[in-house]
Amino acid sequence: MEDTLYKSLKSIKEKYDSNEKKLLLPEVFNNIKEYTKISKENNSISEIVENFNKFLINEQTIKDAKILLDEKDEEMVSFAKNEIHKSELENQELEKKLRILILPKDENDERNVIIEIRGAAGGDEANIFAGDLLKMYNKWADINKMKLKLLDYANASSGGFSQVTFLVEGDKAYSKLKFESGVHRVQRIPVTETQGRVHTSTTTVTVMPEVDDVAEVEINPVDLKIDTFRSSGPGGQSVNTTDSAVRITHLPSGIVVSSQDEKSQISNRESALKILKSKLYDLEIKKRNEETGKFRKLAGSGARSEKIRTYNYPQDRITDHRIGFSTSLKIAMEGKINNIIEALHAEEQAEKIKEANL
């Protein structure tokens, strides 16, 4: 292991051990805020420390075993050689793992995620495909034991949605879905096509970390214009006879959000505010990343010219253009897209390793 990596890991371990001692101090133990802060910090580095400790134990095993190589007893020498070989192999794998674990983490990876899908170029077919993508993500959420909850939608007359917004709750939901952001292109023969021609349409997908802490995004009430309207269910059927749906306009930014899937106006107001805060937070993240040069190459901006993925129905092929990865479209639309997600994360890790010179 290189000296730079070893020193970094040693420093993290020392920080962890120091924090563990602090947690036992009465002044920390009795201070919930401080105790929570230190515990959270240690939880974020515990996996690194656990694996580095295994590495150190193996190093000591190798050191002790090398002393036994000078023994005259052949069985003892053979045992020592096996221990050295076994420990060296384990440390090779541990080093690979530690190189990834030590990489900078996205501060939002642990959050839930809010996703907005909009039909873009292609009219009716784009809206229908927006509905197909919603079904795909819903199936993915079920497979991965996550919960998908509709927040808002605008039904399209021909089926599907011109816009649909939903929340995905679960372990590291944002981390797993953050690279879905961008333009998704579909190539297929629409049901209304009489001559069998393949049409190309696009939908835009925007992925935002859910903001669940009020203090993270401060909104002045005077900056909000709030309207109510009658909600309708997915597909256009009326589900409410009162104006329970809520639309909020953030006047300084011009952002407009709405929620209509909750049963009461109060709940829809809370959901709409959550979407608004997540949009404002996402804008701040992008601005900060652009200023510091940390904009992720794999995270699409949502610009119409930026096509991140193509869904080719005639050829049963889905291709992610950022990494040149292709797989079965039929399987992917059943929510089985973890192979794509994992390939994107592998590319992200490779980029970070290159940037960190590890």
Curated annotation (Swiss-Prot):
InterPro entries: PCRF, Pep_chain_release_fac_I, Pep_chain_release_fac_I_sf, Prokaryotic/Mito_RF, RF-1. Keywords: Cytoplasm, Methylation, Protein biosynthesis. The keyword Manganese does not apply. It is found in: Cytoplasm. The modification N5-methylglutamine is found at residue 237. Signal peptide: none annotated. It comes from the Bacteria. One of its GO terms (cellular component) is cytoplasm. GO terms for molecular function: translation release factor activity, codon specific. Methylated by PrmC. Methylation increases the termination efficiency of RF1. SMART domains: PCRF. Coiled coil: none annotated. It holds the Pfam family PCRF. Belongs to the prokaryotic/mitochondrial release factor family. Peptide chain release factor 1 directs the termination of translation in response to the peptide chain termination codons UAG and UAA. This is Peptide chain release factor 1.
